[in-house]
Regions:
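C-terminal accessory regions
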Residues: 627-742
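Conserved pre-motif I regulatory segment
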Residues: 319-347
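ASCE P-loop NTPase helicase motor core
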Residues: 337-340, 345-518
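Accessory, non-ATPase domains that flank or precede helicase/AAA+ motor cores in DNA-metabolism machines
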Residues: 1-319
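Loop/turn positions that initiate beta-strands
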Residues: 57-59, 601, 628
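Conserved helicase motor core of P-loop NTPases
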Residues: 462-623, 741
């Protein structure tokens, strides 16, 4: 940049330059910095923006605009910046003494500048061996100093290259992974960004490759295109593999290359071991290696646990059941007793059943029986909400599976679990609730952490929707007919009084619901027009339900809808509900994101797993906010470009580059509601696309309610959903892997 203070530059931005006098604040994760600079005109200004690795004593040139902060006054908001090396001995000394270069403190900085003066940087960069002439600097330390110095400007180069494609947070991640060689690696093959750097997909890497002049049929591009199709279908459609011909056909549409080029590269990927091809029912199928290994291990470990499960003796177990019955002053049904005995007789046991069939009662009894035997028991569920509900119903602490496995970060900030095959859980019995939500990769991690001889009990409702991630583990295990399974079917008298329970079972059996009742816990409000449906839902959330039940959308009411689109989809409903529940107001900050606005006080949802976001809960720090977690925006700092969200007392900060991970949550999709329960559930009924008018989607939605279900809209839609028992096919191979262990 050719900069002079205050002169307008490209895109209408202003330019400024000066030496950094003071770093007021710096976020190491995303590079957000607040600093004071001293300009050539002897003025001091405050700069704010993403300026990673900026240090006192450096000279900075920046493009941006002037803003007025409500508390701190006039500031220069930086859009683009460059660092320049200090030129004078005084500035060089200040920079080196600031701690910016690892291995150089104030004393060492003084010695270096005293010896080499204005040539200090030249020596550090190109002749580091000369530094060993200075007392206290060994040849090894001299090399470390030189490497640290180079890192400062390697980061600058990465930031400059990435600013056309990514936000600063992604640029920092790239530099942390590959260091000074990052740009060389990216320019050789930009597709290495896919799968290696969080938040970078194929389309973005493809744009970089195009700008770098890479050919459309380059092997690197075709290889990543094929792997991307597999990755996308695992993450978005739940497939652990794809038929090879389907994979190549989808990749052809994505890449616009010839089929023979794609088939050749698929064969090369198989030869290199990057994908694994096997035959299922005579069809050649392609896996990403991690998913193939996970299916193989899951089958092997499940069978090993089942074989090793010690039968604790039916007479002994029945005696303990009688003891528990006396303690609780109740008598278990025949099928419930069978379930308890099966849990004590097998290494792997599956308990399934719909609402009101007594699953919770059985789980409490199983816990009590194993506890009486002196066995160590761990309770867990896939989501935080499900774990919290399990704790309440079982009367024992339950953790998320991630917490049970002690999630942490290893080299290169990669997620890993401290509990694994090398450091297994000490518990003798592992009980997992909402097991229908377990995807393949989480199941693989869980099984690796279970010690030989321990028992695994999986509890869930097989009629719920499949997990969001790849695989259909719970369903595949049950359908394999390989493990002891009890399905509870009897609806107990108290549950029979609930229309939620009876209507849920009616739906599950293909029968129409009772929508005529005007009292109880299940209501239907007929509306013919989608706009009327949305207006009624807004009125229910804003006035009628808070007045009648004392609950709000923040503490008990959840709108659940099958679709994102349409007048009664999440996008339109969230906009309508936000306008009546949390409208704009003076002093209430807001930020436009994509096609909606986030506002202080809004109910929001995390829509993708973020394992590296930091949270603080009552002074305790941790990492990870997960897909489906719901919180409330507490603060939007427009000057620092940060949004603070409270996820049930876990306080997190999002910079603006992370806002694609949040969306409004006054209304959520049925898929996002999995594993959660709410006191009041409202569901719109309108003409969705046929693939969403399914029985198990309706069943999942109404079983999310603890106390009240309200359906609003067209009653014929409810009938159409009951009639449609279609389920989207998932390509999963666990059942095939289990067959090998019969």
């Amino acid at each position: 940049m050719d900069l002079k203070n205050g002169i307008a530059d490209k895109e209408g931005l202003l330019s400024i330059e000066g030496s950094v006098e003071k770093i007021i604040y710096q976020n190491e994760e995303n590079g957000y910095t607040v600093c004071e600079i001293f300009t050539p005109s002897d003025e001091i200004f405050t700069l704010v923006g993403n300026m990673p690795y900026l240090s006192e004593g450096e000279t900075v040139s920046a493009l941006g605009s002037w803003v007025n902060h409500a508390t701190f006054g006039k500031q220069f908001k930086v859009e683009f910046y460059e660092k320049q090396l200090p030129a004078t001995e005084t500035a060089i000394l200040k920079y080196l003494a600031s701690g910016a270069v690892r291995g150089i403190g104030k004393v060492t900085a003084q010695r270096i500048v005293s010896q080499f003066g204005a040539d200090s940087f030249e020596v550090i960069e190109h002749n580091p061996q000369w530094l060993s002439e200075i007392p206290g600097i060994s040849p090894k330390k001299a090399e470390q100093i030189s490497a640290s110095f180079a890192a400062q400007f390697g980061m600058r180069n990465v930031m400059m290259f990435c600013r056309e494609y990514f936000g600063p947070t992604t640029a920092v991640r790239i530099y942390k992974k590959w260091g000074n060689g990052a740009l060389e690696r990216i320019k050789q093959n930009p597709y290495i960004l896919c799968g290696e750097i969080y938040g970078v997909g194929f389309e973005k890497a493809d744009a970089i490759a195009k700008d770098l002049g890479m050919k459309k049929n380059a092997p690197e591009r075709i290889a990543m295109g094929l792997k991307y199709v597999l990755m996308h279908n695992a993450a978005s459609n739940g497939h652990s593999f794809l038929p090879l011909d389907k994979l190549c056909a989808v990749a052809k549409r994505l890449l616009s290359c010839e089929m023979n080029e794609i088939e050749d590269e698929a064969a090369a990927l198989e030869t290199r071991g990057e994908i694994v091809c096997v035959r299922h029912e005579g069809m050649k199928c392609a896996y990403l290696r991690d998913y193939y290994e996970a299916e193989k291990y899951t089958a092997e470990k499940l069978c090993a646990l089942d074989r090793a499960g010690k039968n604790l003796g039916e007479d002994n177990v029945l005696s303990l059941i009688s003891m528990v019955e006396r303690e609780s002053n109740m008598e278990y049904a025949v099928l419930q007793k069978r379930a308890i005995c099966q849990a004590a007789s097998n290494g792997v046991f599956i308990l399934t059943g719909g609402p009101g069939t007594g699953k919770t009662t059985v789980v409490r009894a199983i816990i009590r029986v194993f506890d009486a035997m002196g066995l160590r028991i761990a309770l867990a569920a896939p989501t935080g909400r499900a774990a919290k509900r399990m704790s309440q119903s079982a009367g024992e602490e339950a953790k998320t599976v991630h917490r049970l496995l002690e999630m942490e970060y290893g080299a290169e900030d990669k997620l890993r679990f401290r509990k694994n095959e090398n450091d297994q859980l000490e518990d003798d019995v592992i009980i997992i609730d909402e097991a229908s939500m377990l995807d393949l990769m989480l199941t693989d991690a869980l099984l690796k952490a279970i010690k030989p001889g321990a028992r695994l009990i999986l509890i869930g409702d097989v009629n719920q929707l499949p997990p969001v991630g790849a695989g259909h583990v719970f369903d595949d295990i049950i359908k394999s007919d390989r493990f002891a399974t009890v399905e509870l079917t009897h609806i107990f008298r108290q549950a029979q009084e609930s229309l939620i329970v009876t209507n849920a079972h009616a739906v599950n059996h293909g029968e129409y619901m009772n929508l005529e009742s005007k009292s109880g816990d299940f209501f239907f409000l007929p509306r013919q027009e989608d706009a009327q449906t949305a207006a009624t839902i807004a009125e229910l959330c804003k006035k009628r339900l808070p007045k009648s039940y004392g609950l709000t959308v923040f503490d008990g009411i959840q709108v659940i809808t099958p679709s994102r689109k349409g007048d009664a989809g999440t996008e339109m409903l969230n906009s309508a509900l936000q306008s009546v529940i949390n409208p704009p107001a003076r002093g209430k900050a807001e930020k436009k994101v994509r096609d909606f606005t986030l506002r202080e006080g809004d109910k929001v949802m995390q829509i993708k797993n973020n394992y590296d976001i930091e949270w603080n809960k009552n002074g305790t720090q941790g990492f990870g906010i997960f897909n489906g977690d719901i919180g409330v925006i507490k603060k939007i700092d427009l000057s620092e470009e940060l949004i603070t969200v409270d996820f049930e007392d876990k306080i997190c900060e999002y910079d603006y580059t992370m806002l694609d991970e949040l969306e409004l949550a006054y209304a959520i999709t049925v898929h996002k509601s999995q594993g959660s329960e709410y006191p009041i559930v409202i569901m719109p009924l309108y003409r969705y696309t046929p693939k969403l008018l399914t029985r198990n989607l309706l069943y999942t939605a109404i079983t999310r309610a603890q106390s009240i279900v309200i359906l609003v809209g067209n009653g014929e839609v409810a009938k159409a959903m009951v009639d449609n028992n279609r389920q989207t096919k998932r390509y999963t191979g666990l059942r095939y892997a289990l067959e090998k262990y019969d």
